[in-house]
């Protein structure tokens, strides 16, 4: 059967977008987490590591310092600064990306060498911690069980051989490591968590621990640096960011003792942003300045993470190419807001994002909110259907 001729670009529309639901194989190396300007590890190398370790491929990129700095600037502009919101949908995104670009290029780039030196120290410390932990797991000696004997057991000529625990020693070591995580500070806890993820993945995929300890350390170090390493960079750039924002005349959002949260829920492309004018009117009726709200809409980050025009005819796949990195930054924003909650510096929040884990339950079936709404004193929920 002859295939239908492809439609010219002008004939594509919302119900016929001209793209498949899966990213074409040829475009996988263009995922932003693996592009050479962003990561020291390309897609193919990360895929091989994922096939070996059982971890998701996106966890095994190796983001460069410059990219991690960009993540931290993105979340700070979003959470800390008042971003002008105009009448059109595009205005907020243009303003946000412009502010991020001004701070990044004007203030972070000149300090990048110093930031890189600081991050290298973080990386060396993490590598040392991980090496010790890997040695601990690989040399772990499982506790022994003494053989049971009856009342007349001493009359037996030969004692029963000592039985070891039925669990493999590396699993026992992992369990003990998990129990220690909650008692550690952020840095060692993050090292432990990264290593637990890697070793668990390898055991699930290979059925045993590998003998190449250096490989385990390297994979765990990637996981650590992409996550906690970014938080450490956040500490390094905090004074630079504050000075930059003040020099540019940007307005810091005031902390609120009783934050108001407006949370818009709905599927991707459901039109959540179209509700914003009504939310603005609601704020006015409550006597709350709209400029005091942090406008959290991660979709506006996409065009900062990727130059759509560079894709040519493949520009329609831009959302897929940025999606995995967007999740990275989104989780970092959650962590940053949790830190602000501890220091009681949370502003009013307008949240416009779609999260699959919004109503996640734990292993015991209990609901535990992961939403930023949990930081609100008064919460308004809006649903776009």
Q: For the regions a protein language model found, what residue spans apply to each?
A:
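Intrinsic disorder
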Residues: 258, 266-269, 323, 327
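Conserved catalytic-core segment of NTP-binding enzymes
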Residues: 373-374, 382-385
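Pre-Walker A (Motif I) flank of P-loop NTPase domains
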Residues: 256-262, 345-347
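Pre-Walker A adenine-sensing motif
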Residues: 242-256
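Conserved nucleotide-sensing/catalytic segment adjacent to the nucleotide-binding pocket
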Residues: 288-376
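Long, basic/Gly/Ser/Thr-rich N-terminal segments
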Residues: 1-241
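Glycine-rich phosphate-binding P-loop
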Residues: 262-286
């Amino acid at each position: 059967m002859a295939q239908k001729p492809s439609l010219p670009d002008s004939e594509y529309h919302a119900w016929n977008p001209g793209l498949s639901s899966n990213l074409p194989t040829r475009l996988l190396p263009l995922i932003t987490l693996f592009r050479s300007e962003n990561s020291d590890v390309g897609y193919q190398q990360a895929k091989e590591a994922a096939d070996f370790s059982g971890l998701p491929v996106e966890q095994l990129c190796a983001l460069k310092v410059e990219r991690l700095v960009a993540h931290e600037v993105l979340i700070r502009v979003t959470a800390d600064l008042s971003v002008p919101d105009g009448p059109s949908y595009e205005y907020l995104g243009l303003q946000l990306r412009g502010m991020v670009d001004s701070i990044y290029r004007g203030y972070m780039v000149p300090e990048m060498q110093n930031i890189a030196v600081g991050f290298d120290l973080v990386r060396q410390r993490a590598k040392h911690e991980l090496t010790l932990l890997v040695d601990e797991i690989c040399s772990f000696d499982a506790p022994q069980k003494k053989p049971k004997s009856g009342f007349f057991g001493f009359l037996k000529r030969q004692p029963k051989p000592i039985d070891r625990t039925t669990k493999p020693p590396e699993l026992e070591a992992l369990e003990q490591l998990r129990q220690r995580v909650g008692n550690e500070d952020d840095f060692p806890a993050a090292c432990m968590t990264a290593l637990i993820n890697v070793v668990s993945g390898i055991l699930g995929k290979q059925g045993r621990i590998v003998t190449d300890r250096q490989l385990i350390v390297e994979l765990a170090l990637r996981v650590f640096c992409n996550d906690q390493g970014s938080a450490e960079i956040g500490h390094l750039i905090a004074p630079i960011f504050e000075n930059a924002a003040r020099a540019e005349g940007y307005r810091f959002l005031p902390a609120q003792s009783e934050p108001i949260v407006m949370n818009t829920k709905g599927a991707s492309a459901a039109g959540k942003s179209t509700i914003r004018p009504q939310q603005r009117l609601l704020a006015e009726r409550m006597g709350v300045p709209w400029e005091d709200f942090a406008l959290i809409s991660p979709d506006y980050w996409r065009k900062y993470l990727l130059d759509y025009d560079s894709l040519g005819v493949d520009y329609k796949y831009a959302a897929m190419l940025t999606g995995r990195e967007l999740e990275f930054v989104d989780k970092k924003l959650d962590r940053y807001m949790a830190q602000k909650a501890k220091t009681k510096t949370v502003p009013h929040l307008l949240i416009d994002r779609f999260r699959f884990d919004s109503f996640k339950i734990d292993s015991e079936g209990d609901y535990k909110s992961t939403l930023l709404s949990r930081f609100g004193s008064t919460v308004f929920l809006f649903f776009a259907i």
